[in-house]
Amino acid sequence: MALDEQLLSMELPFFYKQVFVEQNQSLLSSVAMSLWSLFHVTGKPKVFFSLGRLSNSVIDMLEVYNETYSRDFLSSSSSEEIGALIIIDRNQDYHSSLLTPATYSGLLSEIFDINCANLDLNVKDTKYKKGKVDFCIEEAAATSKNTTMILDSTTDNLYGEIKHRHFSEVLSVLSSKAKLLKNEDIKALGIKEMKHFVATKLQQVTLYKQNLVNHVLACETIISEMSNKFENLKISETDMLNNRNKKLNFTFVDEHFGTDIHIYNSLRLMCLLSLTQGLSYEEYNTLVNKYLLAFGYKYLYVFNNLVNAGLLVQPSSLKLSLNISSLGNLSDRLPRWQSSFQAAANKLKQLPSQPDKVGSSSPSYVFNGGYIPLTAVLCNTILTSETLSEALTKLSPLTELKIGGNVVANLKDGMETLNEKLSNIKLNSELEFGCKDVKSMSKMLKSDPNLGNAFPLKPKSVLVYVIGGVNYAEIAACDVVQTAT
């Protein structure tokens, strides 16, 4: 389903729960078939990049379809519309899902309910208010008629102009648009001009005015809901990402659970702190108890689901959990340790050293200059690299990255078929059929750095497929990369 310009969705709301929480991978065949069907129309890209166990499985399924269901009408030539395919598991970059976005479209999704690009503009009973402990009066909200906004750039040009902008710029843009409408002097038109205006432009102007009113109302609601919290969230989230001020960060989250607890956003802060700086046994139990006291023990299963999905790291036991913060000033004298996330993020340059000085030309502006989404890093690297070897060198910190497509297909002359691989497979070995590990290709790349002649990428277009869903901030970051390249 097309939700917006250059944005497609399978619209399976239960997909994430089934695949990541319940560990049921039966829907991956639907993902592979959707790509298989698309390639019947566009042709296959020259090179595939997969990141994550689920993405690797999808690439393998595509290769099985190639061998089993190959038909004459599937073009064997490379696609003239898509230069490369990136498939990435959602759990490879959970941080982009947990951070508070700074773009207009991202904040819309924070405050309002959005379903298939239809936004419920209910300013009295927003999604944000529904998540508070003191729930709003539901009866009054149910009787009022709500406005529905369609977040589609093809039908709402104004939304297309402001959707990826930093929220601080949106009100000034809307103000300038309102002044332009006010300056139009319809009274000065003659009879013929008036008839022409009514026949051709009146409906468009009326719709434009309504869209303008809706966007102004949405902005006012965002400001009223987020104004007091946005700056503190920005500072704490940036410190978490850069592994700074662990004690202050936990205090901030702990106070949030005590005074301003939210059924969703509080869990996001807890998960972000857990993934970036870790939680001790005591800290973990403190936050869990406060959440259950606020919302009830019927939500105890939520924490088990978060652990299963990889969003939350549960400390094993009190004996094995080392609470560094309890050692007082000693923690300040210890050398700073880095988690695997921070080590990889620094190598990939995802954490700008000066977030406050980042402009809109950097993809990190979508998170207030604090973090560049992994999808944007992948796209930028693939679009700017001159050879395959250069691209893989830049992406070397991603240990789970694999390659498929024509680059691997050219190496299959005389290789085993899938049935031969299955018959010869050994216990505890990993089956690589549709994609190959980067390390296994390193020797070949030394003799031929541009193996398969896939780089520089032509055409310069990349299809990004996120298994588990993508958010508006990541889309905005990829849009910055598209503009720059």
Predicted regions and their residues:
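Extended, well-folded catalytic/binding cores that form a central cleft or groove in large enzyme
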Residues: M1-T485
